[in-house]
Amino acid sequence: MKILVPATSANLGPGFDCLGLSLKLFNETQIQKSGVFSISIGGEGSDNIFLKKNNIFVNIFYEIYEKLSGKKDNFRFIFQNNIPLSRGLGSSSAVIVGAIASAYYMSGFKVEKERILDEALIYENHPDNIAPATLGGFVCSLVEKNKVYSIKKEIDKDLAAVVVIPNLAMSTEQSRQALAKNLSFNDAVFNLSHASFLTACFLEKKYEFLKFASQDKLHEINRMKNLPELFEVQKFALENKALMSTLSGSGSSFFSLAFKDDALALAKKMQTKFKDFCVQYLEFDDNGFEIC
């Protein structure tokens, strides 16, 4: 079997831990039953010995496979990782969702996306990345009694993303330590109103309002201080026809959205201006993970 799991960008400014969308940048994993266990890694993490000795995908896969099938089989895993690690593009969510879905498939169980999403919550306790990795598109999610409730909206085909990826890795745990311990009443209202309005913009295709709807007072500024160049990235994007420009997840990547022609032009300009960063033009994925 082969499974493709997309990269994701979460929060989208004010939608902390609840909003996210799916990008056409995929981790690809092939799994086959084998006489002996083996693992090979290409792309991101290929030079990391730890990922071969203690691979999270493999650990989750075996945990669920053995629970579902009651068997202890050996498998051959071939990873082609295209999602940058610890850059705020959902690399950990792609691993979690991919491992769970693969285990269900290889156990002979029906792969139901709602079930996969609920199980993924065991390993990642906020749904902003795991939901779009599972469902695709733009997704608004919440958790109630250990169940994920999500509403998905397909993203307009005329839109594309420009993602700026710094060399600095930034784990979610590390990034959360930069957050303020308390939030003022006014700032809480600001984020609630902006997250709600941002969601409505995607649902109703009111993209002209995204620039101010995507503003945040909860997490972005404190996280961006770890890499001050990101303030310049955001300013440059918004001055060059980006409809919105926000920190991607917990960082360090930065996500900008624009109409396709504008996004292509923006990507070229950013490649010239921010030579030390990787800049990628990406279209949006509306399917979530797919098993081939």
Swiss-Prot record:
State its location(s).
Answer: Cytoplasm
Keyword field contains Kinase? yes
Q: Which reaction does it catalyse?
A: L-homoserine + ATP = O-phospho-L-homoserine + ADP + H(+)
UniProt binding sites for ATP? P84, L85, S86, R87, G88, L89, G90, S91, S92, S93, A94
Which SUPFAM superfamilies does this chain map to? GHMP Kinase, C-terminal domain (SSF55060), Ribosomal protein S5 domain 2-like (SSF54211)
In its UniProt record, which GO terms are filed under biological process? threonine biosynthetic process
Gene3D superfamilies the UniProt entry points to: 3.30.230.10, GHMP kinase, C-terminal domain
Keywords annotated in UniProt: Amino-acid biosynthesis, ATP-binding, Cytoplasm, Kinase, Nucleotide-binding, Threonine biosynthesis, Transferase
Q: Look up the record and name the pathway of this protein.
A: Amino-acid biosynthesis; L-threonine biosynthesis; L-threonine from L-aspartate: step 4/5
Assigned EC number: 2.7.1.39
Q: Which InterPro entries match?
A: GHMP_kinase_C_dom (IPR013750), GHMP_kinase_C_sf (IPR036554), GHMP_kinase_N_dom (IPR006204), GHMP_knse_ATP-bd_CS (IPR006203), Homoserine_kinase (IPR000870), Ribosomal_Su5_D2-typ_SF (IPR020568), Ribsml_uS5_D2-typ_fold_subgr (IPR014721)
GO MF annotations in UniProt: ATP binding; homoserine kinase activity
Q: What the protein does?
A: Catalyzes the ATP-dependent phosphorylation of L-homoserine to L-homoserine phosphate.
Q: Which PANTHER family match?
A: HOMOSERINE KINASE (PTHR20861:SF1), HOMOSERINE/4-DIPHOSPHOCYTIDYL-2-C-METHYL-D-ERYTHRITOL KINASE (PTHR20861)
| Protein name, as recorded | Homoserine kinase
Its lineage opens with: Bacteria, Pseudomonadati, Campylobacterota, Epsilonproteobacteria, Campylobacterales
